[in-house]
């Protein structure tokens, strides 16, 4: 899963660097009460959260109520956490993401302004990823040369996979420039 892959890579890097850490697991059935985990991690400097923003918001609230001042660090899944928490703990949360809603890049500004006009809200990482996915697929579809609406779905899928993984195919979107490996794995710069 998304979270497990990030967790495994982070843990491997910590081991490689010789960084000491404490592991805590979260009950998949109980995603509302994180007091036991926060109590065990209270004296840590950083708590790594390879999760999505809903649970991260609950953990941030629990940290605030238990006097835990650790930096909560994660990836793009935390984009949106600000809407889940009180402003007093926002400075504790840090995450990396390929999308910056405040970017001055023309294509990003255009996307942000269009999104704001339509939804009366700022887009988050998930909206930007969806936008890029649609246009990457659209561009791959154009590259296939297939323009027959009645084309066989399997043939179309094969043609699109070939197009998107070709060495000359890339998509420069609002979250970065993307290329795809033969396996389908996406590389983003």
Where are these regions (language model features)?
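Extracytosolic ligand-binding ectodomains
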Residues: 1-189
């Amino acid at each position: 899963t998304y979270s497990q892959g990030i967790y495994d890579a982070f843990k491997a890097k910590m081991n490689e660097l010789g960084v000491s850490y404490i592991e805590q697991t979260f009950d998949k059935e109980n995603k509302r009460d994180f007091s036991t985990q926060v109590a065990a991690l209270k004296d840590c400097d950083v708590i790594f959260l390879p999760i999505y923003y809903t649970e991260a918001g609950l953990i941030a609230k629990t940290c605030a109520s238990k006097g835990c001042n650790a930096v909560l660090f994660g990836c793009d899944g935390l984009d949106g956490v600000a809407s889940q928490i009180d402003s007093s703990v926002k400075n504790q949360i840090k995450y990396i993401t390929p999308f910056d809603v405040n970017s001055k890049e023309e294509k990003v500004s255009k996307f942000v302004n269009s999104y704001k006009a339509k939804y009366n809200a700022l887009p988050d990482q998930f909206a930007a990823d969806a936008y890029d996915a649609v246009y990457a697929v659209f561009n791959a579809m154009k590259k296939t040369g297939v323009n027959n609406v009645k084309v066989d779905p399997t043939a179309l899928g094969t043609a699109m996979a070939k197009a998107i993984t070709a060495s000359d195919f890339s998509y420069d979107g609002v979250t970065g420039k993307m290329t795809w490996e033969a396996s389908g794995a996406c590389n983003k710069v």
